[in-house]
């Protein structure tokens, strides 16, 4: 839905091959992140799953550092404090059952994928405008997630009128105003710093 709304703006800007490649990678990784997140929500507690997915900034900082980037010392301190809090929340579930442990693991993998998505988005927007990037990324994400949903047997079209309005609200609010603003920030700020917003 979001890709269709941003398409008219994206068509106005040139498309660089390297940027498109990173946008496609970001779209695939974003879809896998969502799959991992919702899988985690089914297998572990919402509190633990959400907290573990919030490890995204730490993964982003590690990936940026490994690629030669710079992370401010204050950012590291903030992430360490957050990591301790996440550990206190997740540590309870690790001892309960195999399912919840696997759910926690899925959440951690989802966090790492979210970090990769942010870094890929940052690389894509070195040569692409944000509207072009989000159009490609959101479209690839939906096309990657669609067959997974169909194979899993989920109903993806038979919604009530109220549910369609809710979906429209999510597209306009959460996706275009929220998610796309994150992506726009990646043109100017390090992925690790942008990722810190998930803690607020």
For the regions a language model picked out, list residue spans one by one.
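Transmembrane alpha-helices of multi-pass small-molecule transport proteins
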Residues: 1-32, 57-63, 113-120, 135-153, ...
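Residue-level signature of transmembrane alpha-helical cores of multipass secondary-active transporters
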Residues: 22-27, 38, 50, 79, ...
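Loop-to-transmembrane alpha-helix entry segments
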Residues: 16-21, 50-53, 66-88, 100-104, ...
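Membrane-interface helix termini and inter-helical loops of multi-pass transporters
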Residues: 42, 88-102, 149-167
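Helix-helix packing/entry segments at the starts of transmembrane helices
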Residues: 49-55, 120-142, 172-200
